[in-house]
């Protein structure tokens, strides 16, 4: 790649976003299968972004459970989105099938009380429905985050779950990612050079 410009043009490849998105999704799927998981439930912002190539809005950051994604077997990711943000995802992220964008059943991590238990039941029922749709309901679900409400509801629903954070951490740097890191380093490097 001869040019690292950030603006897309029709006469240079520059950053191939499709290739990066495909790489990340397939890499997550590969790691999921290597760990004998039928599905991955991703609740941390960085993992949701890695698999879905969507951005977590500021008010959802660092709050696992407000927005999450489910990767089942060889299927496209299912994104459970906050409110009507899903409408914007449908418009701006055509790589996620429209039928795979759902409303999230959200609670803030570690919440207590009857309302949080009601929400986590809806949350779990929605996960099981998607896992059945992709024929992985009898397989182990990898999770990158779990709280006491999820733990209790997963046990009640007879969901076999395991560590999903470790597979997500096992990544290598594709050449495209190296290019992006070089681009993001350029402005501060220029600043220090001028000092």
Task: Show where each model-derived region lies.
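Extended, charge-rich low-complexity interaction segments
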Residues: 193-195
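A composition/biophysics-driven feature that prefers long, compositionally simple stretches
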Residues: 1-191
């Amino acid at each position: 790649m001869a040019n690292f410009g950030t603006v897309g043009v029709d006469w240079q490849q520059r950053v191939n976003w499709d290739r990066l998105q495909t790489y990340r999704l397939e890499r997550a799927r590969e790691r999921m299968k290597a760990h004998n998981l039928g599905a991955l439930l991703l609740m941390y912002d960085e993992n949701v972004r890695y698999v879905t190539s969507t951005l977590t809005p500021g008010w959802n950051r660092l709050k696992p459970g407000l927005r999450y994604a489910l990767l089942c077997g060889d299927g496209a990711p299912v994104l459970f989105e906050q409110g009507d943000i899903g409408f914007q995802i449908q418009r701006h992220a055509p790589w996620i099938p429209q039928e795979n964008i759902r409303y999230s059943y959200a609670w803030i991590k570690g919440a207590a009380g009857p309302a949080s238990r009601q929400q986590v039941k809806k949350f779990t029922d929605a996960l099981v429905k998607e896992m059945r749709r992709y024929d992985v309901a009898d397989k182990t679900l990898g999770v990158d985050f779990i709280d006491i409400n999820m733990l209790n509801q997963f046990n009640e629903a007879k969901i076999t779950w395991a560590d999903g954070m470790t597979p997500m951490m096992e990544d290598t740097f594709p050449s495209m990612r190296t290019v992006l890191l070089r681009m993001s380093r350029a402005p501060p490097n220029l600043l220090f050079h001028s000092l």
